[in-house]
Structure formats: structure tokens, C-alpha cells
Amino acid sequence: MPTPKKGARLGGSASHQKKILSNLAASLFEHGAIKTTDAKAKALRPYAEKLITKAKSGSVADRRNVLALVPNKEIVAYLFNELAPKFENRPGGYTRIIKLENRKGDNAPMSQISLVLEETVSTEASRATRAAASKKAAEEAQTEEAETEEVVEAPAEETATEEAAEEK
């Protein structure tokens, strides 16, 4: 992996940044969610998502590449055997960053980065719910129109009866 060039370095040197990201990714995969600073969470997100994408393929070469980046065999085994199948139907967006309150000691902006393990809603299911919702809305609109027509007609009839009474 080449030296990171984009943005500020975490920890000062490139090697320290690599170790920080490696340890953060290992903790994220182990616990499912971690609290860290905004900068570290934003740097960790693409790093972790690339590792998960490699784990989804499941090849031996990808396993060795991930082991080179996260040198913890138990966590890599968990990533490939347990987590990767959960993300099989998800094309990306495996992590979520939630902003938290600033840290008490130094007022650093904090975030929680977590794995998104919820099932994705298929497009067919979302289409079905949208169609059902639109049918329901159309029925409600028709009933409202019928009610407004009745209300509009009622005063017209009253005025006609009043006019007839005035003529007599």
C-alpha cells in the first residue's frame, strides 16, 4: 500500500497511520461499532469497506492481502467466514458514521462508526410498498373529492330552494 497522500495524516507518519487504521479496522470488525474521533472515522470508512469487499470475494489471495493489512488471524477469519456472507447482497455502504458529542477532556469531535448489518430492502419489495401506498392515496383522494362534491352541491341546492321560496 503506497503512502497515504490525501488529507492530514493520523499520527504523524505514514507507517503510524497504517497501524492506526489497521487497529481501528480490527476493533470495528471485532466489536461491530467503535467510538473514535471524526477524522479517524472518516479515514477508517473507505479502508474498512475495501477490506469487506475483498472478504466478499473470499479468494485465498484476497485473504492474504487482508492478513497483510490486518495481522490478526482470528479477526480476519471472522471477517471472511461470518461478516462477508451478511454483506453478500449489499453492493457497498457497509459502514455508518454517527456524530456524537464532543469529548469532555479536549473537546474533540467524536463519532461512532458501526457496521450496517440490517438487510437491504429489495427493489421489488420497495416497488410493491410504493404501489400499495399510491393506491391507498388514490382511494383517499377519491373519497375526499366525493365528499367535497357533496358539500359543494348541498349549498347549491339550498340556494335553489331558497330562490323557489322567494318567488312564491
Curated annotation (Swiss-Prot):
Example GO biological process: translation
Gene3D superfamilies, alphabetized: Ribosomal protein L17
Top-rank lineage group of the source organism: Bacteria
Spans traversing the lipid bilayer: none
One Pfam family of this chain: Ribosomal_L17
Any GO CC annotation of this UniProt entry: cytosolic large ribosomal subunit
UniProt KW Secreted keyword: no
Keywords carried by this UniProt record: Ribonucleoprotein, Ribosomal protein
Biased composition regions of type Low complexity, renumbered to the chain: 124-135
Annotated GO MF terms: structural constituent of ribosome
Self-association state and partner proteins as the record states: Part of the 50S ribosomal subunit. Contacts protein L32.
Family: Belongs to the bacterial ribosomal protein bL17 family.
Protein name as it appears in the record: Large ribosomal subunit protein bL17
